[in-house]
């Protein structure tokens, strides 16, 4: 059996990636989120496939087909809520995974980090298009507002928006193409995940100290497969609690009203995992400026490796940078809260202050803290 595992052309790749992979001995539970994300992706593809068997991407029947799935299909309600809440868990794991990368300096693996940023954009696009499919009020108006942002692009903006819509408003053509893209993108994400892992295994995993651990590694299986199963059990526990007890906790009640182009909801807002970016978008009174800030709020991750001024890789032994990191985490929570609030005083000013501090911490304070810590260490 060992020989087949190590010599078979296909099994050899699996073996080198998941079984005999040399893994640092010191990695903590924060390294669990990669495997959890893989499981989330597999679950989303599987539940999505079963939903697609019963869903119809037509403006007249989309809302009814989702109702039909919940009422008439065997365990359709379970599949639907697993898919909807699975997306929330996916983003929880994703943000914690990125946070881990920032904290422990994993962004110095440039290829892995950049593929990760592309993955983040792709997952966000997929989630946004998935939110449009039930064709409720928030689906319709969310699609209208977010796609309309592209009209801020000079010269080609309006043409681009109408091209994406497939007409002069969000309608049947938009829903059909969003369904097509929502179906195909997870498979593109899977391909990108393989590339992400390929680049990661070129360098090997980082560890909490940020120091090379080539001389101190153990096989991934059985040590980390067992360790990852604990994280998996906790994630399933959280997911099933959400699905079976509070299935609509993270959703929007407006989405239980069929889409009506003649009636605008009082507060148009995306799902909770986009609220931080939505708050940054809304904090700038100019349309183009807001769109640029929205894109930069994610794209800023790409220049973080260039802003790494410290001689140490990880934040483990850097107290000033640690304080800034947790300040950034708190700031993101404030932005998430503001994104769900109406555009009125005092929320406007809180959002603007939080947006400015978000970029200031990343672009200015973190690099300065790195230089100060170098001085303190007399490096």
From Swiss-Prot:
SUPFAM superfamilies for this protein: a domain/subunit of cytochrome bc1 complex (Ubiquinol-cytochrome c reductase), Transmembrane di-heme cytochromes
Residue sites binding heme b b562 per the record: 83, 182
Keyword Iron: yes
Top-level taxon: Eukaryota
PROSITE patterns assigned: CYTB_CTER, CYTB_NTER
Function as written in the Swiss-Prot or TrEMBL entry: Component of the ubiquinol-cytochrome c reductase complex (complex III or cytochrome b-c1 complex) that is part of the mitochondrial respiratory chain. The b-c1 complex mediates electron transfer from ubiquinol to cytochrome c. Contributes to the generation of a proton gradient across the mitochondrial membrane that is then used for ATP synthesis.
Protein name: Cytochrome b
């Amino acid at each position: 059996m060992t020989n087949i595992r190590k010599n078979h052309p296909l099994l050899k790749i699996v073996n080198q990636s998941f079984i005999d992979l040399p893994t640092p001995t010191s990695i903590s539970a924060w390294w669990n989120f990669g495997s959890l994300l893989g499981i989330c992706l597999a679950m989303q593809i599987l539940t999505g496939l079963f939903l697609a068997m019963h869903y119809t991407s037509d403006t007249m029947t989309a809302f009814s087909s989702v109702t039909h799935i919940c009422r008439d299909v065997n365990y359709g309600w379970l599949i639907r809520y697993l898919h909807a809440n699975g997306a929330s868990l996916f983003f929880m794991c994703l943000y914690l995974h990125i946070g881990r990368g920032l904290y422990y300096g994993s962004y110095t693996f440039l290829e892995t980090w950049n593929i990760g940023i592309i993955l983040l954009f792709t997952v966000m696009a997929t989630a946004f298009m998935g939110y449009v499919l039930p064709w409720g009020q928030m689906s319709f108006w969310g699609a209208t507002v977010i796609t309309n942002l592209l009209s801020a692009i000079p010269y080609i903006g309006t043409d681009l928006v109408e091209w994406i819509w497939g007409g002069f408003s969000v309608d049947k053509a938009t829903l059909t193409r969003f369904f097509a893209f929502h179906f195909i993108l997870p498979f593109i994400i899977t391909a990108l995940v393989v590339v992400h892992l390929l680049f990661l295994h070129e360098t090997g995993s980082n560890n909490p100290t940020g120091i090379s651990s080539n001389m101190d590694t153990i096989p991934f299986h059985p040590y980390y497969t067992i360790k990852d199963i604990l994280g998996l059990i906790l994630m399933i526990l959280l997911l099933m609690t959400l699905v079976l007890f509070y299935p609509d906790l993270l959703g929007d009640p407006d989405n239980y009203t069929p889409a009506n182009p003649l009636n605008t909801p009082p507060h148009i807002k995306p799902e909770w995992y986009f609220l931080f970016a939505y708050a940054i978008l809304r904090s700038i009174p100019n349309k183009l400026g807001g769109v640029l800030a929205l894109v930069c709020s994610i794209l800023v991750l790409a220049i973080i490796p260039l802003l790494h001024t410290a001689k140490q890789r990880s934040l483990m032994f850097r107290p000033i940078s640690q304080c800034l990191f947790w300040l950034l985490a708190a700031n993101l929570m404030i932005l998430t809260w503001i994104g769900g609030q109406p555009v009125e005083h005092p929320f406007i000013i809180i959002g603007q202050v939080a947006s400015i501090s978000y970029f200031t911490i990343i672009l200015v304070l973190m690099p300065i803290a790195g230089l100060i810590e170098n001085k303190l260490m007399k490096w």
